[in-house]
A protein has these predicted regions:
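Short glycine-/polar-rich loops that comprise or flank the Walker A/P-loop
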Residues: 81-83, 107-109, 134-137, 152-155, ...
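Conserved P-loop NTPase nucleotide-binding/switch module
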Residues: 121-145
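Short, structured patches in soluble enzyme cores that scaffold and shape functional sites
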Residues: 115-117, 140-143, 161
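Glycine-rich, charge-decorated loop segments at or immediately adjacent to ligand/cofactor-binding or catalytic sites
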Residues: 71-75, 145-160
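Conserved small/polar residues in nucleotide/adenosyl-binding loops
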Residues: 171-172
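Hydrophobic/aromatic ligand-binding patch that stacks against planar heteroaromatic rings
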Residues: 55, 103, 130
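Long, charge-dense
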Residues: 62-119, 124-127
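Detector for small/aliphatic-rich hydrophobic stretches
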Residues: 1-63, 77, 82
Length: 172
């Protein structure tokens, strides 16, 4: 869809109005890195991103270094056909980062999710610059322990498990 379908230009609604109120521009920015700092993997981060991913009607979604492959039947049930998913795994960090940059630069996907622990600030800056020029959703999912590490990401959110779902706070 065009700018009409996705609300404010350069922003995709999160699907959660209370979260949109907290997010700059009223949704997930498609102009730069969004860093999600997770207390642990599998606490509901994919459920959080699902409404935004569902809005990418027909576009591919790149998943780099996912900690585990999501259930394909579960994806299909949530309106995300597995054939739209691009799984990328690499053993060397340099290859992971290169792949992420290529995805951002070639514009063939609507979203990129990168799971990564320690990354040099310079490498994150390169990704951020590529993401700024991409008009794609670009989430980097890292351990909460990285909250104190320098990051060029304009938006850094800390995600912790909560009895009612997720506790989301800004990480600085």
């Amino acid at each position: 869809g065009g700018a009409m379908a996705s609300g404010c230009a350069g922003v995709t609604p999160s699907g959660y109005p209370p979260l949109d109120e907290l997010l700059p521009g009223g949704g997930w920015s498609r102009r730069g890195l969004i860093e999600l700092l997770l207390q642990q993997n599998g606490i509901g981060e994919m459920r959080l991103l699902l409404p935004a991913l569902q809005r990418l009607a027909g576009q591919r979604i790149a998943l780099l270094q996912p900690p585990h492959l999501p259930q394909l039947s579960g994806l299909r049930a949530r309106g995300l056909p597995p054939e739209r998913m691009l799984w990328i795994r690499a053993s060397r960090l340099s290859d992971v980062l290169w792949s992420a940059e290529q995805v951002l630069r070639n514009g063939s996907c609507g979203a990129l999710l990168l799971w990564q622990g320690a990354v040099r600030t310079e490498a994150l800056r390169r990704l951020h610059m590529a993401a700024q020029a991409s008009d794609m959703l670009c989430w980097v999912l890292r351990p909460l322990a990285m909250a104190d590490a320098p990051s060029p990401a304009p938006l850094r959110l800390a995600l912790r498990p909560h009895p009612e779902g997720l506790q989301i706070g800004r990480a600085h």
